[in-house]
Amino acid sequence: MRKIYLTILAFLSWAAMSVASFAIDVIVVSHGQANDPFWSVAKNGVDSACKDMKIKCKYTAPGTFDMVEMAKLIDNAVSQKPKGIVITLPDAAALGKSVKA
């Protein structure tokens, strides 16, 4: 849980930077589904921060807690070459290769 909070805090800190001079797109890859009570709060926070900072964000998560699917989502996010990628990391061993990409 601590890692999740630190990830969200890091994203919000990053989002607080001035973005007026350039367009930013960010992809958030979470292991928590947006329909889960906890993760719905996190997704709403991401959406709110992105709206406030006028940046384009996309929140993605696997349909269930699935590290293989999450790795695919991370790989897909990397291939889109956004300005930023924010991830949660519930299993570093399973996601390490995708994260290093």
Features from the language model and the residues they span:
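A residue-level marker of the well-folded mature domains of exported/periplasmic proteins
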Residues: 2-5, 21-101
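Bacterial N-terminal signal peptides
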Residues: 7-20
